[in-house]
Regions:
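Extreme N-terminal starter segment of soluble prokaryotic enzymes
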Residues: 2-9
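Short beta-strand-to-loop element that shapes/binds the nucleotide-sugar donor at the catalytic cleft/hinge
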Residues: 85-91
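Residue-level recognition of beta-strand->loop/alpha-helix junctions
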Residues: 11-13, 44, 115
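CN hydrolase (nitrilase-like) catalytic-core segments centered on the catalytic cysteine
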Residues: 64-84, 155-204
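N-terminal phosphate-binding loop and adjacent alpha-helix
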Residues: 11-31
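Active-site beta-strand/loop signature of hydrolases that rely on acidic residues for catalysis
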Residues: 7, 22, 33-60, 76, ...
Length: 204
């Protein structure tokens, strides 16, 4: 792992169902992070589309790689930064199957993706209605080190972070769209997951 690098945690506002505007905001934020000497920029869960889009998800979902990831790859290549963002992924194999996916791109293009394993179905959350759960941890070799990806509710379940660490992750990145009222839970959980796995952890 690189001895030292700078991460920009980009807690941007995402417009529901407006990919064009969200991509514009992502690009603007990446350019700003570049000026501030960041090496990696991390955006929230489903930052491409916004979190609450309900049935529009079927029109908004894309394959990965696909049109939007190609745009983000171009931005990453131009700025020479690593970018992590969330989006609804349309399966290239099974019709109408959609995943809640984290995507990692870098200076050389597309690096990899992770599909959220644990889908909440309580309170305002109805992810199981729209998404299929993923089933494997994801860790990727980068110029910065071995980066593992998890998404929001996954962090409540120790086995997800543990599997990610056992696959070699030196930095675990958790992207989230959780409301601020749950901040205390996530502050406790992020500390616990980092300590029990002796790994760095970044949370957006």
């Amino acid at each position: 792992m690189k001895e030292e690098f700078k991460i920009s945690l980009a807690q941007i506002r995402c417009d529901a169902a407006n990919k064009t505007e969200n991509l514009r905001r992502i690009e603007k934020t990446v350019i700003k992070a570049k000026k501030e000497f960041a090496d990696m920029v991390i955006f929230p869960e489903l930052s491409l589309t916004g979190y609450v889009v309900r049935d529009q998800i079927y029109e908004l979902a894309e394959t990965v790689p696909g049109p939007s990831t190609t745009i983000l790859e171009s931005i990453a290549k131009r700025t020479k930064l690593h970018i992590i963002f969330g989006m609804p992924e349309l399966s290239g194999k099974t019709q109408a199957t959609i995943y809640n996916t984290a995507v990692l791109v870098g200076p050389k293009g597309f690096i990899g993706k992770y599909r959220k394993m644990y889908l909440p179905t309580h309170s305002v959350f109805e992810e199981k209605r729209y998404f299929r759960p993923g089933y494997e941890a994801a860790v990727f070799d980068t110029e910065l080190g071995k980066i593992g990806l998890i998404i929001c509710y996954d962090i409540f379940f120790p086995e997800v972070s543990r599997l990610t660490r056992l696959k070699g992750a030196q930095l675990i990145v958790c992207i989230s769209a959780s409301p601020a009222v749950r901040r205390t839970f996530f502050e406790t959980l992020t500390t616990a997951r980092a300590l029990e796995n002796t790994a760095f952890l970044a949370f957006v």
